[in-house]
Amino acid sequence: MSGRQRTLFQTWGSSISRSSGTPGCSSGTERPQSPGSSKAPLPAAAEAQLESDDDVLLVAAYEAERQLCLENGGFCTSAGALWIYPTNCPVRDYQLHISRAALFCNTLVCLPTGLGKTFIAAVVMYNFYRWFPSGKVVFMAPTKPLVTQQIEACYQVMGIPQSHMAEMTGSTQASTRKEIWCSKRVLFLTPQVMVNDLSRGACPAAEIKCLVIDEAHKALGNYAYCQVVRELVKYTNHFRILALSATPGSDIKAVQQVITNLLIGQIELRSEDSPDILTYSHERKVEKLIVPLGEELAAIQKTYIQILESFARSLIQRNVLMRRDIPNLTKYQIILARDQFRKNPSPNIVGIQQGIIEGEFAICISLYHGYELLQQMGMRSLYFFLCGIMDGTKGMTRSKNELGRNEDFMKLYNHLECMFARTRSTSANGISAIQQGDKNKKFVYSHPKLKKLEEVVIEHFKSWNAENTTEKKRDETRVMIFSSFRDSVQEIAEMLSQHQPIIRVMTFVGHASGKSTKGFTQKEQLEVVKQFRDGGYNTLVSTCVGEEGLDIGEVDLIICFDSQKSPIRLVQRMGRTGRKRQGRIVIILSEGREERIYNQSQSNKRSIYKAISSNRQVLHFYQRSPRMVPDGINPKLHKMFITHGVYEPEKPSRNLQRKSSIFSYRDGMRQSSLKKDWFLSEEEFKLWNRLYRLRDSDEIKEITLPQVQFSSLQNEENKPAQESTTGIHQLSLSEWRLWQDHPLPTHQVDHSDRCRHFIGLMQMIEGMRHEEGECSYELEVESYLQMEDVTSTFIAPRNESNNLASDTFITHKKSSFIKNINQGSSSSVIESDEECAEIVKQTHIKPTKIVSLKKKVSKEIKKDQLKKENNHGIIDSVDNDRNSTVENIFQEDLPNDKRTSDTDEIAATCTINENVIKEPCVLLTECQFTNKSTSSLAGNVLDSGYNSFNDEKSVSSNLFLPFEEELYIVRTDDQFYNCHSLTKEVLANVERFLSYSPPPLSGLSDLEYEIAKGTALENLLFLPCAEHLRSDKCTCLLSHSAVNSQQNLELNSLKCINYPSEKSCLYDIPNDNISDEPSLCDCDVHKHNQNENLVPNNRVQIHRSPAQNLVGENNHDVDNSDLPVLSTDQDESLLLFEDVNTEFDDVSLSPLNSKSESLPVSDKTAISETPLVSQFLISDELLLDNNSELQDQITRDANSFKSRDQRGVQEEKVKNHEDIFDCSRDLFSVTFDLGFCSPDSDDEILEHTSDSNRPLDDLYGRYLEIKEISDANYVSNQALIPRDHSKNFTSGTVIIPSNEDMQNPNYVHLPLSAAKNEELLSPGYSQFSLPVQKKVMSTPLSKSNTLNSFSKIRKEILKTPDSSKEKVNLQRFKEALNSTFDYSEFSLEKSKSSGPMYLHKSCHSVEDGQLLTSNESEDDEIFRRKVKRAKGNVLNSPEDQKNSEVDSPLHAVKKRRFPINRSELSSSDESENFPKPCSQLEDFKVCNGNARRGIKVPKRQSHLKHVARKFLDDEAELSEEDAEYVSSDENDESENEQDSSLLDFLNDETQLSQAINDSEMRAIYMKSLRSPMMNNKYKMIHKTHKNINIFSQIPEQDETYLEDSFCVDEEESCKGQSSEEEVCVDFNLITDDCFANSKKYKTRRAVMLKEMMEQNCAHSKKKLSRIILPDDSSEEENNVNDKRESNIAVNPSTVKKNKQQDHCLNSVPSGSSAQSKVRSTPRVNPLAKQSKQTSLNLKDTISEVSDFKPQNHNEVQSTTPPFTTVDSQKDCRKFPVPQKDGSALEDSSTSGASCSKSRPHLAGTHTSLRLPQEGKGTCILVGGHEITSGLEVISSLRAIHGLQVEVCPLNGCDYIVSNRMVVERRSQSEMLNSVNKNKFIEQIQHLQSMFERICVIVEKDREKTGDTSRMFRRTKSYDSLLTTLIGAGIRILFSSCQEETADLLKELSLVEQRKNVGIHVPTVVNSNKSEALQFYLSIPNISYITALNMCHQFSSVKRMANSSLQEISMYAQVTHQKAEEIYRYIHYVFDIQMLPNDLNQDRLKSDI
């Protein structure tokens, strides 16, 4: 190439980044510079001059390029003077002629394969590449291999720089493709990628100048080629199209369709007979062989025809099938007849007859398909097809039954089965059976064509070998055989495989098409082609997959086993040969029909060529093909020899990166862009550089993995030996095995679960490698096999005995564990094994290195076999984990003198178990040590990787039992002694500890390292002794009944809490054997307990995971002993916990000054199961330090609250119960939360389980009291009054120890954040998201019953974030309880007959009004106990209103049945969202009634006089749980009941969630008539006039409306206002209540008139209520208390505006409130706190906003100065206007200061909001799935309407047109299909949770070409669905086509734009904000546009998390209520154990 030409490249290619591949350099004409020349230094001045010249040239190039874009469409006149044709390839005249023609007109080039279509394409592409420097050239091919081939051709033919070319396929990421479109000029891609990029707007359509389409004959119908052209035309007509194909089409119509779709202006056609190509084409001999049917095949054919007649005759008799000869009918004709019958059914055929005819059609179609197989492929293919029908794999049940009744068919089928049954099984084995070539078994030729094919192939190889004597030549020949069906491909391959090694055959098929068929993956296909091309195989049997698109090399013989009707298929097959040498084509046809098909195909081919070449009038060409070259310019031909470099295929990025590091010095300059040493230290880097770094001298250019072995590609023995290629190093998978049996050190990224599993396998392999004979591991495990545990449905293979995550462990049989338990206990609570299996599935136990340990103790096992018989059933929990179980037995059975053997190995066992044991049904591995244990056993380790170096490193104490599981360390009597000295040390250290704050995060790593070196164990950790576990003792078993609830997942699979990052070990060893026999405890120990004043461990398994569903194993008959305690100060842990009492075995290793991840208390199930005692909170002083660590948690002993004064008494084992509790004082600045356990407040408390068959007063003389947590969980040290505890229990009940455990030294694990501590935490602390164990503090210990305690779980089920379907959860709870009580004959249903039960309210354990103090809390406030009020309660359910599941005196714990209905907060003009769980859509699916109303049943009428106090108690307790996260309109059930009319209340459709008898129902009704607010007088509704509006059509939506059925629970509301007037509903947005209440829609005018009226009358109706709130609880209570109880002094004139704003906000859909059930309340600063109160309690003042066109309303002025009005054009959702802040709290002590601070804070937020600009273009977001189904909609919006359309992952949404509106597009056929109805409804409900407005566009189905138009028939299902949608508030629009849909979308978006709610934020998120966007999208019920708003409006996630409700509402452009949801979610403090395992580990590691 000339220098001038290179300059053109450099000039016009400057828009590309000019790196190594500039156009000039890459053209191949320049010589590369020598390395020396590049090193020559230039003078500084000259260098600067060169740089400045380059800059000037670059600017000039860009300027010229910009000018060119404006002139002549970007055509370069200087370059356009010539068009270049390469001479480096032989010049062929036909190619030159076609290339010239294609430059100036859209051309279809038809050339036989192998004659240079690719060359012509390269020439045309190169010239357009030159002519249009700023344009794009696009090549499209249907398959990836063709795309890749064309890139290489363009480079090798024309020298187009590789740096300017790019390949894009579906595997390329969309974001990457967008960058490629901008940076590259010549693009090679598949058509679907092009369609996607055009739809996404990534492709610059206007810049495309040349479009080349390969395999153009595919451009039929709506193929992607056609879509691309249609889309491009919408943007520009100025582009050239070049279409390439070997054949134009199968017939004239197809050719015309291709011409029309691709805008073809001319055809360049060359056939094999054309004179100008004869000289260039090799001779291809086509032989047609006609094979007659044999006698056997003819006989079977005759029988088969008789079967066909019997089935087709009935269709012919009914006149639905044409009368023709049965043998001449075809499958296609029957299909056409069936379609005709469906379109025009006969009037005589109705009802069931129509179904019968359809079935007969289906049978006939199947039989005729078999007939064609028989004729073409033979008997075997027919048999395989019939087998699929008869064995049911094809799912044709009716056909199977009908054929089975036909005698002739069964005879034929049995005959075929005898012939081919063996081959059927062989074929099922897949392709691998081919290579075996079993010559012993005779091959059955199912068709005569097979013999002919065999003859042809053998003859070919014989003749070839005769002609080519050399071995190399013999291997060069290739044979390819084509067949249409896989079965015949398999048959041919099996036949030819008998002729090995002459014939090396392989099959080649496509991907798997179904479950039963196994195809080739793409990798396998490429591997087969590669081996075929390289000589691994010489014969390839292929389906149509091999016809086109793959470079299979030169083939000498092509055999077509069947004929193809389409000439295209035949031409493609024939094109595989004759490319480089003479080829031969053999077509084997059966006599008769197949021969006729072939002849017809050849005739069609000839007619097409004749029509195109001779009579051009037949085809209509595109007449407006652009010339592309400006007028006056006629490019002249310039032949040029183009040289090019070596084509380098594109490598994966990782290879390029590695090469760059290997060859970094190649050009003499080091690549400084790479970091020198990465993460290596200087010494490590030197070591790596010296030993491991690959250099050029190593001559290693590539590192490869071992050859992939495919199961389907065998025959490896014949594979030629791989020549060792120099410079290629193959990695080995085995050379590093010596390092793979233990985890190596890690940095930042820990080992994965998969890695640890692999390590465990390697350990076991290594251990078993040296064994001979029997496996020791198997022998060890075998002795523990319980045959009762083995079910017939599952027997685990031996090699899976370690698979603890087995999903198949499900048994319904009573296990040995249950049997053994029942033998030694009077009563038990056992979960079913099936429930256990649910947990086993969730656990992931990693293999442990215990083999060596087991060997050492195997002898002891045998010796202690008898002892073990009695107890191992308890320890061997029902599971399939042999490791942990065996380990426990080993340790138990060891004699005391042998337990200390080999400390290091035992430690090693624990080491491997670190972070490993997660099996809920297994006792964990327990290790024991003597006093001689080294200090290393208590040390902390920096990284878990080092822990595994058992031989080199010391073992850390955090490996000993660091589990969330209960750890049963059973001890013997001889191991017991007291440790009084520890008591003093503990108490002294505790006080010292409390003087510190937790260390900062930055200092923890150093501290941890020091602790790891210096901390020592000072005491012993003893192992259980089996001798003292006797079955005659009673076992204290705890029930874990919440098995099936969704809460089992909350603390995900018993996650180990002691991670490598948490450096201290915190143990909890429950001891539950302290009671008498009826309480399932050991009797002897119980006597000792009484002497010691010790009580049963009440929080036995506090930290047990909720997934645990087996009974709690306990320590039995054990005495206490010394416990290892870490004693350290700063560098060491403080000794804070004491274990003196003889019955408790606690290990307290809690270095509280280091990072300590304790075992947190599971508040969801464990607490529900076993009432907690002595849980406490550390006071706020400990939380105020800014350096408080996120994971710091406090592990407290249950005795640890004893004061320093108690020390001496403690040492003497005080006998007095009262002293133990009375002596507690402010040692820990901790106050015990003493509260009511009233039935109303047991939403928040955990009730103690006691004997249900006895009066509950009969307990020990110990009374405990716990203040209810109405504040932020401050806890006071209280005098704990003793109460009695009954020693005698009745057998058959479940007893769970209670208050005695208050003294149990088994400490309770609580996170530092403690239970529900949100509201009063420090501002600095509020930013932490610590795991919170909720309801831990509310633990009444007195007077409850078993059922209440267990039914607590039902409440918990409904409170978890996961529970969105309460009904299901209730059922699960019921099942869980019933299964729990199965073996104790005590179930929920049986409870009513369980004898007299006295249900004592536990809320009166303290006198009302008692003052409780928090000595060292933040403000030393005085708590005033709430006193009884005579004032009535507005709620209907003041008592313990539990809807019992049965008519039982035992009422389950009260729980809201439905998510909180914040109907006060309904949005401005939406009520689409369903506020009730059972919305009308759900009713439409599953139920008949409307949404259930939560009517609560009073438990007892005797407490009616206390309703007001009860309501306050209930609300106070609610505040602790939901706090600020719920709005003030809390009680949706009572709200709807109280103010609605009688008719509304007596809604017949109301469904109660539980059964209630008539008397109870009447009680509910009578109670509802009275108002507690008016001293139980009757409630009166004073109605005013009704505003009845009559509409002639559906009114348009109002911007502001009042939600239907919403009744304000405010005394301040106007009593004269009727409930009908309160509800203003847009008919298009009606909720499910509307139909029941018959509410009427009000126009904007009516609403405004009503507002004016109410403002005039509001003053007289005003009534204020005032209560005294406790200071500490005021912050929470005012956020949740109903306004009638609070003292909100609202100006009467503002009431209506408050109400209006209530409805200007959205209501929560049913599923979205589940998360709010268990919210905690972190303390926030006063500004945020006050703003939250304002947002929750007082609604903003907003004016009306117009709907479809702007209307100016008068601004409603408020009479109160602080009020602000907003212009009517501004959306209410964006402007939460503050009202009088002080009105939220009448108490001047809190309201005054916060009011003054809050107002400016809110004002600042208003000013910071950026209003959208009116002039900005309208934007619509489109879901990615719409690219395929709604392409024309997208293109019309973008190209025709000029809207900004962005394709985004919208999470199932179709179109988002504004911040609040989503549009779903559905076709009529989808709406008609009742199968999809439920799915569609679920989709709508999903959208309702995210958007305020929903619109559904019902689009008419597109008519396919040639289809007759059918009239649309409405169905009942269709109409009912539309009705339901309208009733649910969904707007329905109808469209006739996609273009009209685009018009509707445009109108909707413009309407939303006018209302100022359009999309105005950038839709593209840069890389640094993409993670924030993903985080926002992870928030439940957050739409993509909301996340996008938050991403752009908030500078960071931290900024959003610290924002107030108003800010979130404004910036996220959401309603106030949606902002509440977001706020609650962000501030919800949850237990990290709820995270999945990997996330939990990653989170903990990331916090290091």
Curated annotation (Swiss-Prot):
Major localization listed first in the record, in broad terms: nucleus
Alphabetical list of CDD domains matching this protein: DEXDc_FANCM, FANCM_ID, SF2_C_FANCM_Hef, XPF_nuclease_FANCM
Cell compartments where the protein resides: Nucleus
Domain Helicase C-terminal: from-to ranges: 452-627
Interaction with FAAP24: region residues: 1727-2048
Family: Belongs to the DEAD box helicase family. DEAH subfamily. FANCM sub-subfamily.
Function in brief: DNA-dependent ATPase component of the Fanconi anemia (FA) core complex. Required for the normal activation of the FA pathway, leading to monoubiquitination of the FANCI-FANCD2 complex in response to DNA damage, cellular resistance to DNA cross-linking drugs, and prevention of chromosomal breakage. In complex with CENPS and CENPX, binds double-stranded DNA (dsDNA), fork-structured DNA (fsDNA) and Holliday junction substrates. Its ATP-dependent DNA branch migration activity can process branched DNA structures such as a movable replication fork.
Protein name, entry field: Fanconi anemia group M protein
Source organism of this protein record: Homo sapiens (Human)
